[in-house]
Design a protein with these regions (language model features):
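Rhodanese-like catalytic fold shared by cysteine-dependent sulfurtransferases
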Residues: 1-22, 28-127, 133-167, 173-240, ...
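Short glycine-enriched, charge-decorated loop/helix-capping segments at active-site entrances
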Residues: 38-43, 143-144, 353-360, 406
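Generic beta-sheet signal
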Residues: 91, 195, 290-293, 342, ...
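Histidine-centered divalent metal-coordination motifs
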Residues: 141, 266-274, 325, 329, ...
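Active-site metal-binding motif and surrounding structural segment of the metallo-beta-lactamase
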Residues: 163-169, 248-290
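Accessory terminal helices/loops
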Residues: 183-188, 208-210, 368-382, 386-467
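Catalytic core of the metallo-beta-lactamase
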Residues: 209-262, 299-388
Length: 467
């Protein structure tokens, strides 16, 4: 008998005696969900690279049994794994040889970021299990997720805090460790679902919330994983988009849902924490791209600055130059009731002035911008920023904004100029991941593939400071 071949009786004995074993079902997802061996996990790799990553995360000394339809593919993969030193086997003649009862899945084996967000919005009973290392988890995470590193999940007793009456979602950075986590949980008869693409793809989920203000429609688009905020501003069927993020096509979808046609796209400044979708959205919709004339771009655009007007529908946006976060930062005023402030002023803090290595000079400009421009508006003016920080809650209507009156209560804005500059430049916050490359991409000096964006944007946004 082939030493890596395992009969159904042998596998049945292993299960009955509760001998540690990983049973990996490599059939198509639907076949697995329709009926599988109790304690097995679905193991589908999309490429040889992913297969190698998955194997590197498996416990090397544990017995592994591969299951397919007829034993053919499972045998090939078991032989390959054995060559890498694994105690790998395959079920002879595959699942068709298994005479005992098969169990059906009660939940999908994988879930997309969009579908997970829908579940969380609907308050569905889910348990988020983050299997990254503690230092990764502490950097950024989905709120409410519990951290048990994958390296611990195979240790007896490590799964005691995982509820068996909730839908368990496993999470990692790219969806590989989370898949292996489903293997570990299946050993203990815990069904689980792996987040496809992990935190990298979670950072690409967009959620739209609409605010109606008379003739004006404001659609705030939140990049859930990073707290980036974009705005679609509509009037009489026409819309402008401010600070769009990827995926760009979602903005057309959000606008159309409210009966709006995008006629212009704007970036408030050169972003450092996320890749701007402004150029691609403008090209996709065949509209103008508006960028600051005080910042260097290698992108064809309509340059704008202080005092310029951008019409849409029956309304118009007025440009004000609001330097400090960057030299060319702009804010946009609508009807003297709404200000779209970019990274100048946030609900919880202000834009950081140090990302261009001129912190003291930019902090001085930021003080002037805040006190002599933004805070000069009426107290009831609503200010819509381009980010919100961790732990910041939206208003009752689900929109993130502040008012001039509320902004005046921020501790940093209660300081005089010298105190402000001294305090701001002394606050040390880690810079956004990949910020230098992202700035170059947003300038248009280096190209980027859409496939690269999730990895470039990994991590929290770090463009604000607060006391």
């Amino acid at each position: 008998m082939n030493p890596i071949e395992m009969s159904p009786d042998e596998l049945s004995h292993i299960l009955e005696t509760k001998t540690p074993v990983l049973i990996l079902d490599i059939r198509a997802k639907q076949s697995y969900m329709d009926g599988h061996i109790l304690g097995s996990a679905n193991a589908i790799c999309q490429s040889m690279q992913q297969k190698q990553i998955i194997m590197s995360k498996l416990p090397p000394s544990m017995k592994i049994v591969l299951v397919d339809d007829d034993g053919t593919s499972a045998k090939e993969n078991a032989m390959m794994m054995a060559r890498f030193g694994f105690d790998a086997h395959y079920l002879k003649d595959g699942i068709k040889s298994w005479k005992k009862e098969l169990v059906k899945s009660t939940q999908d084996t994988t879930i997309s970021g969009d579908n997970l967000w829908d579940s969380l919005k609907q308050n569905k009973d889910v348990f988020l299990l983050d299997v990254r290392e503690p230092e990764e988890y502490s950097e950024f995470k989905i709120p409410g997720a519990v951290n048990i590193p994958l390296s611990q999940l195979f240790i007896p007793g490590s799964q005691s805090q995982i509820p068996k009456d909730k839908k368990v979602i496993t999470i990692c950075s790219h969806g590989n460790r989370s898949m292996v986590a489903t293997f570990a949980l299946a050993q203990n008869r815990i069904e689980s679902t792996s987040l496809v693409g992990g935190m990298a793809m979670w950072n690409q989920v967009l959620n739209a919330t609409t605010l109606k203000e008379g003739e004006i429609t404001i659609i705030q688009v939140e990049k859930i994983g990073k707290g980036c905020l974009s705005h679609i501003i509509g009037s009489n069927g026409e819309a402008l988009v401010i600070d769009p993020t990827y995926p760009a096509s979602k903005y057309v979808e959000f606008a159309q849902k409210e009966g709006l046609k995008i006629i212009g796209v704007i970036d408030t400044h050169q972003h450092a924490d996320h890749v701007s979708a402004a150029k691609d959205l403008a090209q996709f919709t065949g509209t103008k791209l508006y960028l600051s004339k005080l910042e260097e771009y290698k992108i064809q655009n309509q340059q704008i600055g202080e005092g310029n007007i951008i019409p849409f529908g029956s309304k118009q946006l007025k440009v004000i130059h609001t330097p400090g976060h960057t030299a060319g930062s702009m804010s946009f005023v609508l009807d003297d009731k709404f200000v779209f402030s970019g990274d100048t002023l946030f609900v919880e803090g202000i834009g950081r002035p140090d990302l261009r290595d001129q912190a003291e000079e930019f902090a001085t400009k930021l003080y002037d911008t805040l006190h002599n421009k933004i805070l000069k508006f009426s107290d009831d003016v609503k200010i819509f920023p381009t980010h919100h920080g961790e732990g910041v809650k939206p208003t009752q209507n689900g929109i993130y904004y502040t008012t001039v009156k509320m902004a005046k209560t921020l501790p940093l804005l209660d300081l005089n100029q010298n105190e402000f500059v001294s305090k701001v430049v002394s606050i040390t916050t880690p810079r956004p991941m990949n910020y230098s490359m992202i700035i170059k991409i947003n300038k248009g000096t280096i190209p980027v593939s859409p496939m690269q964006i999730p990895d470039l944007e990994m991590g929290p946004n770090r463009c604000s400071i607060r006391m």
